[in-house]
């Protein structure tokens, strides 16, 4: 009898695993299918052949080693911002402030890169990367503390901090940190010792891509093999139960927000030290918000994040060249990305709205009681 029960339980476990796999697969395939159908309709409307254009995009994104390098280079910042988003969403914290942490982390790393002496040699690069991650962690630690201690809505606080980050970095790059030897809106160049090496010269793919993969590996190990990772997942599933079994919910919230800022700031640092070499207005074209879409497309899983980042990187790298070889404008890529982001917004609403409703209900109960 016990063997039969064990077999049934094993079968149920396998069934649940297959079900979760199918759900993730559908969650990846459906937004992509709809996005490309919308893009195909737009192409037909302007008299283009969708099959030919999509084949051209695939060729431009993955046709040879140089094009693959360009795609991976475009995907690199998204590896960081998607992990920074996923680590919070997995814990039930709706952090939309990754863009701000990316900006301040990037500026912090670049600041050290041109102010510390070049004589530090090989020590300069890790110092800059670490400082960028630290500033990013502090940046998002603050709204995490406000949420944990005073229940300040994290969606509002982190969204507003994006504007604060843009304002602060914009002021500094146009004022105290403005380069004396360049035009407006740029800092001085970092020392050569602070730059991340190129992986496939003359392409722009740099070692930040490898750092991004290490960040995803660290995220996966943290989720599956650390007590704090299990506690964060439990908080995301059911805060009341987490409290009942002794998990510090406020402490977990502060931790995941700080870790999110760490990854986002590290991403900004890698982008600055490997791609830009200086900070300027327009340092980020919205990597934080695109990372949100990547994380949701990948269902917060490490492999899903890699897939989503490479997909968006392919769209970005191919989009800049297809308009040179066809009559298709760059807006086609925006259509595909925008449709995926609509699905991401729907997913955020599906998760966040009930959670916010439960939070307000608890607040009303507390006020009434």
Describe every region a protein language model picked out.
Residues 1-34, 40-44, 237, 244-251, ...:
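Cytosolic-side transmembrane-helix boundaries in multi-pass membrane proteins
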Residues 258-264, 268-338:
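Transmembrane alpha-helical segments in multi-pass inner-membrane proteins
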Residues 2-80, 122-123, 127:
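Membrane-interfacial amphipathic/re-entrant helices at transmembrane-helix boundaries
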Residues 118, 138, 200-278, 302-307:
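Helix-loop-helix "hairpin" substructures at the membrane interface of multi-pass membrane proteins
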Residues 28-44, 81-85, 106, 110-112, ...:
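Hydrophobic core segments of alpha-helical transmembrane domains in multi-pass membrane transport
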């Amino acid at each position: 009898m016990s063997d039969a029960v064990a077999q049934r339980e094993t079968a149920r476990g396998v069934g649940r695993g297959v079900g979760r796999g199918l759900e993730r697969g559908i969650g990846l395939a459906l937004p992509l299918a709809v996005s490309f159908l919308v893009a195909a309709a737009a192409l037909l409307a302007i008299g283009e052949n969708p099959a030919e254009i999509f084949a051209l995009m695939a060729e431009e994104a993955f046709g040879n080693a140089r094009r693959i390098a360009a795609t991976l280079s475009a995907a690199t910042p998204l590896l960081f911002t998607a992990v920074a988003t996923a680590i919070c969403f997995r814990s039930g914290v709706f952090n939309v402030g990754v863009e701000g942490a990316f900006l301040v982390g990037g500026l912090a790393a670049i600041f050290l890169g041109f102010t510390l002496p070049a004589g530090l040699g090989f020590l300069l690069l890790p110092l800059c990367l670490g400082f960028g991650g630290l500033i990013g962690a502090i940046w998002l630690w603050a709204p995490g503390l406000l949420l944990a201690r005073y229940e300040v809505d994290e969606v509002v606080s982190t969204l507003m901090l994006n504007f604060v980050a843009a304002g602060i970095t914009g002021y500094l790059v146009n004022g105290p940190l403005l380069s004396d030897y360049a035009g407006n809106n740029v800092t001085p160049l970092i020392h050569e010792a602070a730059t991340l090496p190129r992986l496939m010269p003359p392409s722009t793919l740099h070692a930040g891509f490898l750092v991004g993969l290490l960040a995803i590996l660290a995220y996966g190990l943290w989720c599956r093999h650390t007590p704090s990772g299990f506690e964060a997942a439990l908080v995301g599933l059911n805060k009341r139960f987490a409290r009942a079994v002794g998990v510090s919910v406020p402490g977990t919230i502060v931790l995941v927000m700080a870790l999110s800022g760490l990854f986002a700031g590290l991403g900004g640092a890698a982008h600055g030290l490997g791609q830009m070499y200086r900070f300027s207005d327009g340092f980020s074209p919205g990597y934080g918000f695109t990372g949100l879409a990547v994380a949701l497309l990948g269902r917060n899983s490490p492999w899903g994040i890699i897939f989503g980042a490479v997909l968006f990187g392919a769209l970005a790298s191919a989009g800049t060249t297809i308009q040179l070889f066809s009559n298709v404008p760059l807006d086609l890529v925006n259509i595909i990305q925008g449709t995926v982001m609509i699905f991401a917004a729907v997913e955020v609403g599906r998760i966040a709205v009930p959670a916010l409703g439960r939070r307000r209900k608890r607040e009303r109960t507390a006020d009434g009681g």
